[in-house]
Amino acid sequence: MSTLSPRRSAILTFIRDRIAQQGQSPSLAEISEAFGFASRSVARKHIVALTEAGLIEVVAHQARGIRLLNSEPRPELLEIPVLGRVAAGAPIGPDLDIHTTLHLDRSTFTRVPDYLLRVQGDSMIEDGILDGDLVGVHRNPQASDGQIVVARLEGEVTIKRLQHRGDQLHLLPRNPAYQPIIVTPDQDFAIEGVFCGLVRRE
């Protein structure tokens, strides 16, 4: 493998950091913006070069499908329960019985998910999370600004981006057709877990 240029090394670090911080890889548009490229085609050329160098792969037909490659000789399969639905729209009531169990490649996820939820709605489409997707959830009652979380608000469950504003929490949709959900201190609210990847059934 040839030595990476400083620019491509920086792009690889950007991808790795974004996956670690937000649970998903950046889009070509986000890479272009971060590095000041004039168009997405420039970012695409760098992604192709990193792919040819064996450092990443791009999963076809999968949203934000850049995956970091490692030296493991064979995939590690995880057995993950599917626990019903999560709203990408208005929150919905909990439906957390085990529906089925799937065996999925560990490399699909940025961290090992404790369970999967099926997305209902389209409020997260700009983050590449579509109606019908299965999202991996890593149980964690805490999350940082900008992370995608599965949260329970007044007994109902939703998936949104988390943002702190003063003593309020905002659950941000990623579709301009939806309004943010503002969580006040008097409401019954808990973060159930952090998004760590998705599976899309074609």
From Swiss-Prot:
The annotated site for Cleavage falls at 88-89
Q: Which residues form the active site?
A: 123, 160
Q: EC annotation?
A: 3.4.21.88
Which superkingdom is the protein from? Bacteria
Looking up Gene3D superfamilies in the UniProt record yields: Umud Fragment, subunit A, Winged helix-like DNA-binding domain superfamily/Winged helix DNA-binding domain
As its record notes, the protein acts as a catalyst of: Hydrolysis of Ala-|-Gly bond in repressor LexA
Q: Which cysteines are joined by disulfide bonds?
A: none
Any matching Pfam family: LexA_DNA_bind
Q: DNA-binding residues per UniProt?
A: 28-48
Q: Which GO terms describe its molecular function?
A: DNA binding; serine-type endopeptidase activity
Which InterPro entries is this protein grouped with?
LexA, LexA-like, LexA/Signal_pep-like_sf, LexA_DNA-bd_dom, LexA_repressor, Peptidase_S24_LexA, Peptidase_S24_S26A/B/C, WH-like_DNA-bd_sf
Question: Coiled coil where?
Answer: none
Q: Name one GO biological process term.
A: DNA replication
Q: Does the keyword Acyltransferase apply?
A: no
Enzyme class, one word?
A: hydrolase
Q: Which family does it belong to?
A: Belongs to the peptidase S24 family.
Oligomeric state and partners?
Homodimer.
Q: What's the stated role of this polypeptide? A: Represses a number of genes involved in the response to DNA damage (SOS response), including recA and lexA. In the presence of single-stranded DNA, RecA interacts with LexA causing an autocatalytic cleavage which disrupts the DNA-binding part of LexA, leading to derepression of the SOS regulon and eventually DNA repair.
The record ties this protein, via HAMAP family, to: LexA
* Name used for this protein in its record: LexA repressor 2
Q: Which organism is it from?
A: Pseudomonas syringae pv. tomato (strain ATCC BAA-871 / DC3000)
By which gene is this protein encoded? lexA2
